[in-house]
Design a protein with these regions (language model features):
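The feature captures the short pre-catalytic strand/loop hairpin that immediately precedes
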Residues: 6, 132-138, 160-183
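Subtilisin-like serine protease catalytic core
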Residues: 1-56, 72, 82-85, 99-101, ...
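General beta-strand structural signal in soluble alpha/beta enzymes
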Residues: 76, 104-108, 129, 158, ...
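Short, acidic/polar
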Residues: 55-64
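Sec-exported extracytoplasmic/periplasmic mature domains
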Residues: 25-29, 67, 93-100, 129-132, ...
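Catalytic metal-binding/acid-base residues of hydrolase active sites
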Residues: 79-81, 107-113, 132-133, 162
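Short acidic, glycine-rich surface-loop motifs adjacent to enzyme active sites
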Residues: 63-89, 106-108
């Protein structure tokens, strides 16, 4: 899915999805060290940022597209800055009741005392971040909740600082193989 023609260097969220996708599925290339947590997996890339900002389609539309291509694991690192249980949270919960063999991993945001939607859905895995050199300390910007209802926040945490992963260059025909380090 693409709402436009790819990453736009003019937007502040340029490269975000590419970097996260690389952290999940990257494999070694031309001697570059690094491997994603599910290296050699296949990817359905759903571009939800255009030159004006976020413009994501309805979550049920994205999930239906995933199902049509056989994807059962979902990774979302976006949402709205609200702790409310939204229609998107509800649709994710409904989806996972109807398609119980699928699972979504969702970043809860960048405010430690909050847990933003859709990571507050009840049938997903909320993923917080730790410092890279010490897996027991949460990254200072990692959301962890609790939820608006007072429920626990993250299900799991993963290193979130200094991650070397894929780098977008904004050129659709470059066959870019660059890497970058980021949070």
């Amino acid at each position: 899915t693409s709402i436009d023609d790819g990453d736009h260097p003019e937007h502040e969220d340029f490269r975000h999805g590419t970097h996260l996708a690389g952290a999940v599925i990257c494999d070694l290339f031309d001697g570059i060290e690094g491997r994603g947590v599910a290296s050699s997996s296949q990817l359905i890339f759903q571009d939800v940022v255009n030159e004006s900002g976020w413009s994501e389609p309805e979550i049920d539309w994205l999930l239906a597209e995933d199902l049509a291509y056989g994807a059962v694991i979902h990774s979302y690192s976006w949402g709205d800055v609200t702790e409310a249980y939204t229609s998107r949270s509800f649709l994710l919960d409904a989806w996972h009741r109807e398609v119980p063999w699928s699972l979504a991993f969702i970043a809860p945001g960048n405010n430690p005392s909050k847990l933003y939607e859709p990571a507050n859905a009840r049938n997903i895995v909320s993923v917080g971040g730790t410092m890279k050199d010490n897996g027991t300390d949460l990254y200072t910007g990692s959301s962890h909740g609790p939820t608006e209802e007072g429920l626990r926040g993250n299900f799991i945490v993963t290193p979130a600082v200094g991650i070397v992963s894929a780098a977008a260059d904004g050129n659709l025909s470059s066959f870019n193989s660059d890497m970058r380090s980021s949070t």
